[in-house]
């Protein structure tokens, strides 16, 4: 069984920071499950992951992750990061706010036997992100 290694995560974050959706997708197992808990989205496999990366980086030319720490135990990992960028591009007809964001978060996951991401859950404060962008968070549901 493969264990988590530093180079794998350096390459993974480099791919995100280069907005290289295909390279990010290559880090995912064919049957990977990637969950963005804040958005309530669950992605399946490399193809959906590539589309997600394109969507996530579309509104920010300088979107990137800054790693804070990486903890590993066998094939399990916890990666603390800061998501940084500027909302400087129009998306789906919505004009950019021009505001920057800096939001702390973490990824918790597991690699498969081939050393690719089998499971990943991202946690961050969506309300904090929306407030920094000058966008009101959605009203609580009843």
What are the functions of these language-model segments?
Residues 1-142:
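C-terminal and inter-domain tail/linker signature
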């Amino acid at each position: 069984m493969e264990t988590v290694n530093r180079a794998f995560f350096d390459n993974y974050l480099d791919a995100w920071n280069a907005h290289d959706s295909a390279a990010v997708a290559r880090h995912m197992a064919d049957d990977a499950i990637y969950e963005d808990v804040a958005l309530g989205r669950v992605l399946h496999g490399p193809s959906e992951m590539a589309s997600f990366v394109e969507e996530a980086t579309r509104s920010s030319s300088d979107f990137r992750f800054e790693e804070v720490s990486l903890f590993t135990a066998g094939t399990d990992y916890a990666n603390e990061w800061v998501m940084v960028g500027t909302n400087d591009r129009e998306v789906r007809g919505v004009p950019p706010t021009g505001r920057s964001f800096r939001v702390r978060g973490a990824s918790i996951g597991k690699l498969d036997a081939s050393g690719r991401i089998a499971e990943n859950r991202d946690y961050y404060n969506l309300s904090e992100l929306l407030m920094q962008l000058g966008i009101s968070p959605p009203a609580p549901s009843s």
